[in-house]
A protein has these predicted regions:
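Glycine-rich cofactor phosphate-binding loops and adjacent beta1-alpha1 units
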Residues: 4, 193-195, 235, 240-316, ...
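C-terminal hydrophobic helical "lid"/dimerization subdomain
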Residues: 2-15, 19-31, 280-284, 325-384
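Glycine-rich beta-strand-centered segment in the early N-terminal region that forms part
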Residues: 50-64, 77-124, 160, 167-169
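Residues located in well-ordered beta-strands
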Residues: 32, 43-48, 60, 90-92, ...
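Mid-domain Rossmann-like dinucleotide-binding core that forms the NAD(H)/NADP(H) cofactor-binding site
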Residues: 170-250, 255
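Residues in the short beta-alpha loop(s) of Rossmann-like NAD(P)-binding domains
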Residues: 230, 298, 323
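NAD(P)H dinucleotide-binding glycine-rich loop of Rossmann-like/cofactor-binding domains
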Residues: 119-204
Length: 384
């Protein structure tokens, strides 16, 4: 009866208010969450449902994608415990704080967890991820704010409600919508390369992020070469129209790309795989004067590469991290208009009760695993 209409506007508003109050009263006092307790230690626990204040909303989580940055934090112990991670979050508004007019109980939304101030030195220079406000996480399921998507409910703070919460149109699934933030990061990274139509771009790694990057790069009018160690991922890339693939378990990707470019190498290389040992092969695959984008090197450390490749060969080494408000609308339109069927990238869906298992699989990818999501909004044993 979602499309039913009452006879007068005043009655409709009254009924809507009553339904809103009834749904808000159903919110429990406790919830389940996958809680990070230390290096490689995540437990399913019962925790309080977060309280919200004025200008905030409480989100009932349906789907949260597992991001590689969360996995690195869990594995490295770089962040203090306890925390509840998960930031690729879509769900339904369960409660609204005083003063919230943009959203109502029952609205389907997806949330960003970082939004910059727009006024500081870094914002004025378009390096939003370095803004101190941006570095504050505006979504939490309790403990130190860390996203909170691996829980049943998430508190979305005021500045995220105002600028980082996006309504999901009818006909778009929670699964499709949860890709808004990762797509944003990909669009931002690609813009860093200043690609020109006709250039040859090699994308190293065809996990979900690498495949999105490759799809977007091809959309920009370039010739795309994809590489991966797992042939099923290359098959998936092929199904998205990415037909130039290199099985890196069998061939030297840099050699292949040079053979395809009259010995030069790629105009640009995107490294979409973590691991500093791959930085040098990425640089080697780029032509003299080419560009190399590090997209997955989010853990601080040291790497070995030939400095003459930058100085003498005039190759440019670039980095891109997190999302950009400048491409927020572009990323939303890309996802919500289904310019790419992102749901196809999801290989495994886990209930929250199996969240620890989901994180383990994501941290140890298999040939047949791609995007892995945790779905607090789907009970154990149920179907979508």
């Amino acid at each position: 009866m979602a499309n039913a209409r009452t006879s007068t506007l005043s009655i409709e508003r009254s009924d809507s208010t009553e339904r809103s109050e009834e749904r808000q009263s159903r919110i429990p006092s406790t919830m389940k969450a996958a809680v990070y307790r230390g290096v490689n230690e995540v437990r399913l626990e019962t925790v309080p449902v977060p309280e919200i204040g004025a200008g905030e909303i409480l989100l009932r989580v349906h789907t949260c994608g597992i991001c590689g940055t969360d996995l690195k934090k869990i594995a490295s112990g770089s962040h203090s415990a306890p925390r509840i991670f998960g930031h690729e979050t879509s769900g339904t508004v369960a409660k609204v704080g005083d003063g919230v007019e943009k959203f109502a109980v029952g609205d389907r939304v997806v949330v960003f967890h970082h939004i910059p101030c727009g006024k500081c030195y870094y914002c004025l220079h378009k390096t939003f991820a370095q803004c101190e406000t941006y570095k504050k996480v505006g979504c939490t399921a309790g403990f130190e704010p860390s996203g909170g998507g691996f829980a049943e409910y998430v508190r979305v703070m005021g500045w995220i409600v105002a600028q980082g919460t996006v309504g999901i149109p009818d006909g778009i699934s929670f699964e499709q919508a949860c890709f808004v933030e990762p797509v944003n990061t990909c669009i931002k990274g690609i813009k860093t390369l200043n690609l020109e139509a006709g250039e040859t771009v090699m994308v190293m790694g065809q996990g979900p992020i690498g495949l999105i990057l490759a799809f977007l790069v091809k959309r920009a009018g370039t010739r795309v070469i994809t590489t991966d160690l797992y042939s099923p991922r290359l098959t998936m890339a092929n199904s998205f129209g990415l037909n130039l693939t290199v099985d890196a378990s069998k061939e030297d990707a840099a050699k292949v790309v040079r053979e395809m470019t009259e010995g030069r190498g790629a105009d640009a290389v995107i490294l979409a795989v973590g691991g500093n040992s791959l930085i040098r092969p990425a640089i080697d695959a780029a032509r003299p004067g080419g560009r190399v984008l590090l997209f997955a090197q989010t853990v601080r450390g040291e790497a070995t590469f030939d400095p003459a490749s930058v100085c003498v060969d005039e190759k440019t080494l670039l980095g891109s991290y997190s999302a950009s408000v400048d491409v927020q609308e572009e990323s939303v339109q890309f996802v919500m208009n289904r310019e790419m069927d992102l749901e196809r990238l999801i290989s495994h869906r886990f209930s929250l009760e199996s969240g620890v298992e989901a994180l383990h699989l994501a941290a140890h990818p298999q040939p047949d695993s791609m995007k892995i999501v945790i779905q607090p909004g789907v009970r154990e044993g149920s179907t979508l």
